[in-house]
Amino acid sequence: MKTLSTLFIVIILLFSGCLGIFEEDFDDDDDGFLDTIDAFPNDSNEWLDTDGDGIGNNADKDDDDDGFEDALESSCLSDPLNISSIPLDMDQDDICDVLDDDIDGDGLPNDWEINRSLDPLDNSDTLSCHGYSVYCLRSYDDFTFPESHNAYSALEDGVFMGVNHLTGLQAQWDGGIRAFMVDTHHVSSEDTSPEDVRFCHGSPNAFPHPCSYSEIDAFGWLSLLNSLMNSSKDTCLTLCGEVVTLLIENYVPAEHLEYLFNKTGMSDRIYIHNFGEDWPDIGDLILNGQDLVVFWEQTGDDKYPWLHDFGEFGWTTNYGESEPDEMKCTVFRGNGSQPVWHLNNWLSSIYGVADPIRSNEVNDYYFLLNRTIECWEMMDNRPTFVAVDYWENGEITNVTITINKMEHWSSDIPPHP
């Protein structure tokens, strides 16, 4: 009788639901999500499958199957659960705009553009320096300019004694030369007015006077250079420019040089550097309309701060050696602590003048490239200028193109241009 009573009580409890055996379970995996809305009712680790690919959101790296992983979308401020919400990537460089330092892909950082009133969201509102936007970020002393020694002394322009080049300024410019060594004299010992400034080579005390056997009109030459600098900007689809450097071996009063630069329109574009300060970026020089740097081979004059003493603001290697193996990388003249320097790369003939034959050897692409890298390594400083005679022989401009693509002397050498 007692057994029957116990059985009866159990049956009553079962049907009343008190023992829970017949109670329906609406959350089988006990993950807090009802089975009716749980995409994985028997997996306590998963409950959602936004893209319906059979992989739960917790395990799925791309919940909405839009091609962008969830972590990336979260960083890029797009919705990882909405297939129509994807990271913005204006320049399609696979870096979303939120994380991209160069949103429009023009090679210039966003902050750099904003600080210079350029639009970081418009790749047509940009700046190109020496053909590439990235060079705008280089400081003046962290770029290598091809340089012509005695640039005015060209057979094409009627110079027949002491020739240094076959072709004149126009061809040099078209060939990529952007730094020029020139010598300023008065046309004669008697004609010494500001209007009498010429480009000639030799000692002013020599007989005959150095301008007596060849002279180049300095006013016409600099006016052409000014025009070439202006016209290079006119051919660009966007803002662009190039920085030009003059190194003057001077034999006239400073006020006569001032007259020369004023008359040729060059004064307005000259940059004045304060000794001891960092050199500015090439881009800033161009944007500020100060795309001409002038050095002269004599002591500075406070009345003419734009005439930088090249021996104070920089230095130069030796020059005019007799043999290639005599060429050195070390300081010959000037202040070796300065970052701006000239790597001179020309030989003198047995007559003491430029050698048109052996210029082929020392201007050869691989010879000059290897020498430039060797000197860069030895001095732990990129050459600012590589200067040659007979620039037409060899590949001076191709060498500097290659060098400027290198961040460091130990960088991989890019292919021949």
Residue ranges: model-predicted function:
Residues 9-12, 34, 53, 69, ...:
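Processing junctions and N-termini across compartments
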Residues 2-3, 39, 164-168:
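Short, 15-30-residue, compositionally biased linear elements
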Residues 6, 21, 95, 172-174:
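Short hydrophobic "helix-edge" motifs at membrane interfaces and signal-peptide entry regions
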Residues 1-27:
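Secretory targeting signatures
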Residues 128-417:
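Catalytic cores of phosphodiester-bond hydrolases, prominently lipid phosphodiesterases
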Residues 18-131:
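Extracellular calcium-associated, cysteine-rich motifs in secreted modular proteins
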